[in-house]
Structures are given as C-alpha cells and as structure tokens.
Curated annotation (Swiss-Prot):
The lineage of its organism: Bacteria, Pseudomonadati, Pseudomonadota, Gammaproteobacteria, Enterobacterales. It is found in: Periplasm. Part of the ABC transporter complex LsrABCD involved in autoinducer 2 (AI-2) import. Binds AI-2 and delivers it to the LsrC and LsrD permeases. Belongs to the bacterial solute-binding protein 2 family. Residues 1-25 form the signal peptide. GO terms for cellular component: ATP-binding cassette (ABC) transporter complex; outer membrane-bounded periplasmic space. SUPFAM superfamilies: Periplasmic binding protein-like I (SSF53822). It comes from the Bacteria. Keywords: Periplasm, Signal. NCBIfam families: PRK15408.1. This is Autoinducer 2-binding protein LsrB. InterPro entries: Bact_Solute-Bind_Prot2, LsrB, Peripla_BP_I, SBP_2_dom.
Amino acid sequence: MKAPILKKLALISVLSLACTSWVHAAERIAFIPKLVGVGFFTSGGQGAVAAGKTLGVSVTYDGPTEPSVAGQVQLINNFVNQGYDAIVVSAVSPEGLCPALKRAMKRGVKILTWDSDTSPECRSIYINQGTPNQLGGMLVDMTANQVKKEQAKVAFFYSSPTVTDQNQWVXQAKDKIAAEHPGWEIVTTQFGYNDATKSLQTAEGILNAWSDLDAIIAPDANALPAAAQAAENLKRQDVAIVGFSTPNVMRPYLERGTVKQFGLWDVVSQGKISIHVANELLRKGDLNVGDKLDIPDIGTVAVAPNSIQGYSYEAKGNGIVVLPERVIFTKDNINQYDF
C-alpha cells in the first residue's frame, strides 16, 4: 500500500512544482528604456526592479545600446518569444514599434509605455511624466526666470526630431513662447541623438554660432549636461541653460553656478508606478479611464483619457497615468534627491 501512496505524493509534488513554475512565468515583466547606459533610464529601471521585488514579480530591465527602432523591436520580439506577460517600453518612435507591439498584444502580452509614448492604439496604458502643456510650460517658465529681456535669442536642443515625448514638449514650449514672449527669437533647433560626444559638439556649435545667445532649452538627459559643459568649456556662463535631466548628473553644474535651475520628475517613482500598473493589468485584465490605483509610498494614481496628451484615440482599457508631480531643482533642494 505504501508504494502507491508514495507515487501519488510524488505526482502531487511534481504538479505543485509545475503550477508554481507556471505562476512565476506568468509574472514576468520587461522594462525597456530607449537605450542603456544613461543615468535617467538606469534610475527608472532601478525603480521598476524594486517595485517588482515588492510585488513578488520578476522584472527584467534591458534596452538597446543605441536608440533605434530596430534595437527595441528585437528586444520586444525576444521578450514575447520568451513568454513574458507584460512589456513596458520607452518608445524611440511613435509608429516604428507599433507592428511588433500589436503582434505582442494579439499573443496576449500586456503592452504599456513609459517616458515616451507610441501611438495610443499600440499600447494599453502610458505612464506619463507630465502632459505636453505641463512640461512645455515648465521649460519656458524656467527660461523666463533667468531671461528678463523682452528681446532674446533662444535655442532648442534635445535628442532627435522623431522622439515622441520631447517633440510634444517642445511644440508646446514654442507655442507658449509665441503667445507670452513674442520678442524671443528661436534661432535654431538641434539634436544630439542621445550620444554624449555628439551632444557636446552640437552644444558647442550652437554657442559658437550665436555669440549673443540668451538661452539653451534642452529637455533631454544627454543634451542638458552637454549644454552645461559646453558653456563651461567656452566660458559662456552668461547663457541660461535649462531643461530636463537627473539631479546626480546636473549637481556639479548647479553647484558651480553654470545652471541655476532645471527640471525633471522622480524617474525612480515612474519606474515603480509602471510596474504597479502593469501588475494590476496582469491581475485584473484592464484599467479604464477613471480607475484608480493606490501605490505604497507614492499615493493614488488615476487613469486619464488619451485626450490629455492631444490624442483623438480612445478605447476600453486604454488611457494615461500621469505622475503626481514634477520638480524644479535648485541649489536649495537638489540634495534632497539621489537619482
């Protein structure tokens, strides 16, 4: 009698292990940046991985070494083929990833975006640092805090002409300049393509080309420190350097007075929120406009309609979660942040 009982117990044990393995496999989330090796994205990845540990899900942070559609598509396809249940991606292009993402959704993978969006029909929820109006307004307000002249020359400098988020912010910033500072001349808009060396060369080129430039507006984690370094190299500390980057990267420029203020949001929290939302989708299936989610140590976030981003597309299970706050960093508050 003992042998059959032992066999049954062994079978139950094997089945239990199989079920446990299946549950863990169903809780794998991929978190993809535009590229690896940039502090901003690394910090977002750290937040994502930390949230995964809190929730008991497996989070993999990986991205291409250069910001390309092909690199991100390859990663997306790899994660789908490995059986990941959710993918959260900062898109290098609003349309370029869509075929791969739509294929993934047809296979049951939950697709979210963070930092930089795709077209909304190519994902479910976008974890958004701020609306174009909010972030474009921040850029102009930070510039106006330093450029007091009615007649001024400003340059825009960021990652690329195709990246979704930054182009939306810049479009709003330019509209705000036209409406509120009609005497400001936008002399150029240039790009560093997420390359530190090219970004520094481009920033120095802007400063050399316009000796009477009043401000560089650089809403990009590579472009802003490059603009600050270029101003130091060329001894052009009369130029207001504003934009978006991480406090740890920008702290030396703030301490030396090259930069007076710059902005961002808590990208670590953005990574955490992304994983909490992805996990909620895996648990419940959908989040719809008006739904709320309580996230420990962050607060309550809600799903807003795509229209807040200027989109016309609305659908069930589709919307935007906006981070609760954005931050302007100065000498007075920068040491409160470490990312």
